[in-house]
Structure formats: structure tokens, C-alpha cells
Amino acid sequence: MVSSSLRLPSLTSLLFPATTRYPATLRRTVCLRNRPLSGFATAPSGTASPETKSSEVDRLRSDRAVTPRSQDFNAWYLDVIASAELADYGPVRGTMVIRPYGYAIWEAIQDYLNVKFKETGHSNMYFPQFIPYSFIEKEASHVEGFSPELALVTVGGGKELEEKLVVRPTSETIVNHMFTQWIHSYRDLPLMINQWANVTRWEMRTKPFIRTLEFLWQEGHTAHATPEEAEKEAKQMIEIYTRFAFEQTAIPVIPGRKSKLETFAGADITYTIEAMMGDRKALQAGTSHNLGQNFSRAFGTQFADENGERQHVWQTSWAVSTRFVGGIIMTHGDDTGLMLPPKIAPIQVVIVPIWKKDTEKTGVLSAASSVKEALQTAGVRVKLDDTDQRTPGWKFNFWEMKGIPLRIEIGPRDVSSNSVVVSRRDVPGKAGKVFGISMEPSTLVAYVKEKLDEIQTSLLEKALSFRDSNIVDVNSYAELKDAISSGKWARGPWSASDADEQRVKEETGATIRCFPFEQTQGTKTCLMTGNPAEEVAIFAKSY
């Protein structure tokens, strides 16, 4: 059994006290799934842009409405997760069930990163999730940092265990135990591995995808002969994460170095990518740690160098997790629901066929199938929604909620003109809808790919503009406090003490997110002490 002195309240009770209402979607889900739907509604002309009956539109919007972001960001976030069918609450408080669509986004993250890891010489493997407690105790700062979050197994097979087992919070300790058996000579180095796994941390305050008792991640671990190699590796991996964030998820993260107080327990240096969410809070989206020789000395992980002398290895570890899914939601989503960047979207295009008469159905579905085949052959991830249990208006709302980048509509008139209607998720209403796009395969494929690229670029540019407009340059503690109190990030010169950093946290609720790699040139004066400062730091409230 798992024992802990911590007892977690439910996710909903943490975010929604008894005096407040629960997210709209949590109340409506059962009604929505069981509600009989009316027949199809199309315009008299039978085109692919029907005007759904106003009463039906109102009902559909009511059923799948989300709390406006500006009204309650947390409620909006939970509404989107529920309505877009990304995740649900697990039976154990603080856990979540990742539903197929949410997991498909995680698979897209895995697919990209797996390729990059292997291109840079890393191999996948797997370590046990049960770790002897004595392993955790070997590295003093590590056990101190993780002790409050540990889940312990004390009974197995109905008997008290001789030694408590830790349910994996991270794997540096067990990795080093194995590295000591695999590394003997400099010829065994570098040793570079990665594992995709679940981890458990007994969190007090939870939020789906962002912070849960159990979550999925990848964690890389490497061992090197020199400190220079380890440092190069740590920076290489944070660069891979940075490119992934920008190029795949359209999230303009800021890469940098953590302060001493924010450094991973057991690391010499922690590098991070920090993302600004839609509520202007910071999200630590990925980290890469230069572990120095801290774990290798604790576990005796040594190798014989070229002169036959015994040396401790230099190590790194690095990870991203399913919180990236939460980051995508909170960066790009709007009051309609989820909005996915095309490169990370499990479905890039949804095709909605529309007909009014049975005599029109065969021709419309045949054309829709041909369009699907052409796009699939070209490598586009496409879904044909040909079910006749839902109205076109319902489908439009449903797929918009799920954030599909492009929608193709095909009706009888479009079949006659050999064309389709294309709607962009990121451009609402008529402005995002284009009529008369040819069904000719090469023409349609070229158009769709061009629009997907435009959407990817547009989402990044929008997020970048939002980020930059909400970072304030400050030169005094008073200015820092003003920036934080207004909900913005503060960027300013910093060379103050750990105690000063702790004071900022206690008085403003903000922490140093990072010392960005990109630094301004010239003489700087610490905003807190007035002493010379070599770097600027970014302060923000965070998840």
C-alpha cells in the first residue's frame, strides 16, 4: 500500500470551493451525451455553409459553452479539458485519466522528441518505478528537496517490507545505481539514455495536466568523462526543448538558467524553458540539469580514465512531461475551446459532409471520401465525420471545441462545382471561411498545406506578441512589485542574495523564472541592492 502523511483534496474542491459553481461542462456532460439530436439543417440551396436553426445553435452553444477566459481562467481551463474530451478525474484524489484525444497530443510530443533524442545519440530504456528509500537518502539535497512529495510502499504481499520503497518521483538515484554496474572505463562513455515513464509526486495543490499526483514524462540521463561534455549535453537538450516549443507547439518559451533557490535538488545548474500562459502566469515547460558529480560521488559511479586513474563521471538529466499539454491549452485556447497548432494536432483537417435529401447523400459522401483520400495520401492527418446522428451545426461546434485547425465542408452545390469550403479555427466567423476551393487533388492539397503553415505561424506570432507585451523592464524593487501586482512579468538586473530572492517571493508571490540566455549588453545595477549586476532576471507568478 502507499502511505503518506498528506491527504489530497479533490481537484474540483481545490479550484472550486463550495460557494462557487463547478465548470459548466462538468454539469452538462451527461445531458449532452444522452440528448437526442434533431435532423440535419441545411440552407435551401444545399450549399456547404448551412445556416443552422437559431434555436439549435443556441442549444448547442449552451451545451458546450465554456466559462469565458476573462471571467475565470481556471474554470475556463477545466471546461475546455472536459468539453474537448482531453482528460477526466481519476478515482484517487489528485489523479487524472488522460482520454484518447488528450493522449494523442502526448503521442505527437513523443513522436517528435523520440526522433530528436535518437538523432543526438540517446537510446530508450526503462527503469523500475520502485526505488529503495536508501537510494533517495544517499544524496542529501535530493532527499531534502523531494521528501514532502514522496509516496512510500511499506507493505507488499501482505507483509511489512524490510525497507520502504519509493514510488518513482524521478530516477537519478536508480539510474546511478545501474550506471555503477555498466560504467568501468572511459571507453564506456558517454552513456546516454532516455525513458518514457510515469512518476508520482504527492502534490498538495493539483491541476489537470499541470500538477497531478501521477504524470507522464520522458527523462534523459547521461554520464560523461569531463565537465565540459556534461555542460554541452545539458545545453543541447534545453535547445532541443526550445526548438520543439517554438516549431511544434507555437509556444514562444524563454530559455535560461534557474537561480540557486530554484535549481533542481541535486544539480549544479538547472536550465529551463519558461512559457507565458493566457493568464500571464509562467509555466516551467521543460528542464535540463547539469548534475556535476553530485550523484556519481554519492553512488560511487566511477570510470578508469586513459591513464588508468579512477574518476567520478559527470552527469546530466532532463525532462518534459504531460504538463506541455496543459501549456498548449492555456497558450492558444479561446472562449470557443481548444486551439491546436497544426504540427501537434492529432487531426489537422476535419471534413464535414452536408446533405438535405437522401438522393444527395451518396454523391456528397463519395466526394468527401475522395478528398479525405487525397489529403491522407499527402500526409495530412484528416478525419471524415460522416455520422448521420449529428447535425452539421453540432459537428461544427464539436470540432471547433476540439481545436481542429481546418474544417472542410462539402455540400451538393460544392459537388456540382467540384469545390469545397474551408474554414480556419484561428480566424472566427466569416473572415476565416473561404468558398470555391477546387477539389482537384494537387490544388486542394497545396492549399490545405499552405493554410496549415499559415495557422502555425499565426499562432506563434500571436503568442509571441502577447508574451512580449506583458514583460515589463524594471530597475527598482518598487517597479518590480508594480509589474507583478498588475499581472505582468518583470525583467530587471539582479545580483542580490538568496535571502533577497526569498523576500521577493514572500512579498509578491513571484519567483525568478530564469536568467535568460539572451541578455542585454552594457552596465547594469541590481534592482534590489544597487550593486553591479551582470545579468537580468525574469520574475513572475507561476504554476
Swiss-Prot record:
From the Swiss-Prot or TrEMBL record, state where the protein is found.
Answer: Plastid, Chloroplast; Mitochondrion
Q: What is this protein called?
A: Proline--tRNA ligase, chloroplastic/mitochondrial
According to the UniProt entry, its GO molecular function terms are: ATP binding; proline-tRNA ligase activity
Composition-biased stretches, type Basic and acidic residues, lie in 53-63
| Keyword field | Aminoacyl-tRNA synthetase, ATP-binding, Chloroplast, Ligase, Mitochondrion, Nucleotide-binding, Plastid, Transit peptide
Q: Which InterPro entries match?
A: aa-tRNA-synt_IIb, aa-tRNA-synth_II, aa-tRNA-synth_II/BPL/LPL, Anticodon-bd, Anticodon-bd_dom_sf, Pro-tRNA-ligase_IIa, Pro-tRNA-ligase_IIa_arc-type, Pro-tRNA_ligase_II_C
Under the heading SMART domains, the entry gives:
ProRS-C_1
Q: Which GO terms describe its biological process?
A: embryo sac development; plant ovule development; prolyl-tRNA aminoacylation; regulation of photosynthesis; seed development
Q: Which gene encodes it?
A: OVA6
Say which domain of life the source belongs to.
Eukaryota
Any Pfam family: tRNA-synt_2b
User: What's the stated role of this polypeptide?
Assistant: Catalyzes the attachment of proline to tRNA(Pro) in a two-step reaction: proline is first activated by ATP to form Pro-AMP and then transferred to the acceptor end of tRNA(Pro).
Keyword Chloroplast attributed? yes
This enzyme catalyses: tRNA(Pro) + L-proline + ATP = L-prolyl-tRNA(Pro) + AMP + diphosphate
GO CC terms of this entry: chloroplast; chloroplast stroma; mitochondrion
Query: What's the top EC group for this one?
Result: ligase
State the EC number(s).
6.1.1.15
Q: Where is this region: Disordered?
A: 41-63
The record's note on what follows loss of this gene reads:
Lethal. In heterozygous plants, aborted ovules.
Chief place where the protein resides: plastid
